[in-house]
Amino acid sequence: MASSSSGEAAASVKFSQNTTRAELLIGGRAMLAAGQLGGLADALQTWVVTHPKDAQAWQMLSEVWSRQGEAVRSIRADAESRVAQLDYPAALDRLKAAQDMLRGGQAGVAGRNAHIDASIIDTRTRQISNLIREAATVW
């Protein structure tokens, strides 16, 4: 009964441009618990575009993409979560793992947007590598 009501509550969650962070994250958790991912990835993507330092939103997006079988995107979102937490070495590790997956052509990786994902991941890998190098020269 509880799962039915949580499923009904998740089904009634709607996101708009006026959705607050709290509504997005709480509604997103309800949708994840109910296994209803429709629209959640889009809402989270829209959110992180305007709030790139929101580690929790990136982490939820990573979980959504993982459940949707979007392994590379999931790893990239996890990396962005680490960047938001200023853990650049961990972010770089995840980005390199995503690059390896793309190069290896592992199952669940290739898709119609694989070249776009690869370009974003390559760019972010260079940016994070530069941040790490800059930090090393300061110390």
Question: Locations of the language-model features?
Answer:
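Short coil/turn linkers that connect adjacent helices within long alpha-helical scaffolds
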Residues: 14, 47-48, 105-107, 111-112
